[in-house]
Amino acid sequence: MPKRKAKGDAKGDKGKVKDEPQRRSARLSAKPALPKPEPRPKKAPAKKGEKLAKGRKGKAEVSKDGNNPAKNRDASTVQSQKAEGTGDAK
């Protein structure tokens, strides 16, 4: 059985070799590409006053002396000391 000839054979008969089909038809190639529409500008959010960061919305202000029991993880001991101290004040 004879071997097949490659498309780009050196001997190649141009009449027998089929040309590759065009990717786009002539009608589509004649039309210019449509211009892209300009992007719309984004709307700026309306300002309703001063906003805090998400993590600080519900927290009370921290005093500057550093006696914040929640931050120092002594909340249970500080609360128990305050409860004992109020009973002795009478």
Swiss-Prot record:
Signal peptide: none annotated. The modification Phosphoserine is found at S80. The modification N6-acetyllysine is found at K82. GO terms for biological process: chromatin organization. Pfam families: HMG14_17. InterPro entries: HMGN_fam. Residues 7-23, 37-64 have a biased composition (Basic and acidic residues). The keyword Iron does not apply. One of its GO terms (molecular function) is chromatin binding. The keyword DNA-binding applies. GO terms for cellular component: chromatin; nucleus. This is High mobility group nucleosome-binding domain-containing protein 4. It comes from Bos taurus.
